[in-house]
A protein has these predicted regions:
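Amphipathic alpha-helical packing elements
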Residues: 29-71
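Metalloprotease/metallohydrolase-associated module, dominated by Zn2+-dependent proteases
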Residues: 27, 42-45, 66, 72, ...
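Charged, compositionally biased N-terminal leader segments and the immediate start
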Residues: 2-35
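Active-site recognition of the HExxH zinc-binding catalytic motif
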Residues: 51, 161-177, 232
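Zinc-dependent metalloendopeptidases
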Residues: 49, 74-77, 177
Length: 267
């Protein structure tokens, strides 16, 4: 048993060494050009709160993200700055988590505007109906992320609105890491699941209650559609309108601080 353990440890060390070599190679061989990074980071006000060290780390993550993903424009030509804008916002939630959380899928599909998709919906009698929906973004389990460029531009222009389609879809990807989409991503060690579920369930119930009683809400009502959408929408608020989240759902904000390992309200 000890021999097997030593062998596995040696394999882990070798794999880590190979990953570090590949990382250095990609960063050296395929760097984001200064003009593209400067233009993108200047436009993305949500990045301005980051320290110089965090910005440098985000640039590295974005470089590796661009190398590992395939960008597919449908009805739109994607230039370097557009790709960097997408990559930087996609990597912001995992800035202190690690790029490996965004592995297992490759494609990022971008439409010029909101796009229609067909989904099967089962009614109370078990009859399947096909429903056409207009979306600004979509994330598939082990599949692509689909985005609307016009919505990305809108998010950039109104960056403190609590809306960011890229962060929303990345949150879905994080939520799906354990194979289900239920608003509970794989949590860190010493993050008790009951504490997470209690904070989010209470906030979710409160939002649903306010909507059912026609009360005005400070949170996008779309969050009340499901626990998965609640997590994704509130992740948007955490990064773009953190004060709104902290004031309305302080326990959720604290859980997100622990999960994302970031404190946007302090900047």
């Amino acid at each position: 048993m000890a021999t097997v353990r030593r062998y596995l440890n040696r394999v882990d060390l070798n794999m880590n060494f190979i990953r570090r070599i590949k990382r250095r190679y990609v960063l050296h061989r395929y760097p984001i050009q200064h003009a593209a990074w400067s233009a993108a980071s200047d436009r993305l006000e949500i990045l301005h709160r980051l320290s110089a060290v965090e910005k440098a780390h985000l640039r590295e993550l974005s470089t590796l993200f661009l190398y590992g993903k395939q960008f597919i424009g449908i009805g739109i030509d994607l230039d370097d700055e557009m790709r960097v804008i997408i990559a930087a916002q996609a990597c912001l939630p995992i800035l202190h988590l690690g790029l490996e959380l965004l592995s297992g899928w490759t494609d990022i599909i971008v439409y010029p505007d909101a796009f229609y998709v067909n989904h099967d919906q089962v009614d109370e009698y078990g009859v399947v109906h096909q429903q056409e929906r207009l979306l600004s973004g979509e994330a598939w389990s082990r599949g692509p992320i689909v985005l609307s460029w016009s919505d990305i531009e809108r998010d950039i222009s109104d960056c403190h609105s609590g809306h960011n389609v890229i962060i929303h879809e990345i949150a879905h990807k994080l939520d799906m890491l354990d194979g289900s989409s239920n608003g509970i991503p794989p949590l860190h060690y010493r993050m008790p699941i009951p504490k997470w579920t209690s904070a989010l369930h209470d906030a979710y119930s409160e939002l649903q209650h306010d909507i059912q009683h026609y009360k005005r809400t400070c949170i996008n009502p779309y969050a009340a559609n499901s626990p998965a959408e609640f997590f994704a929408v509130l992740s948007e608020y955490f990064f773009t309108a953190s004060e709104v989240l902290a004031v309305n759902f302080p326990l959720v904000y604290r859980q997100f601080q622990q999960y994302y390992r970031q404190t946007p309200l302090d900047h």
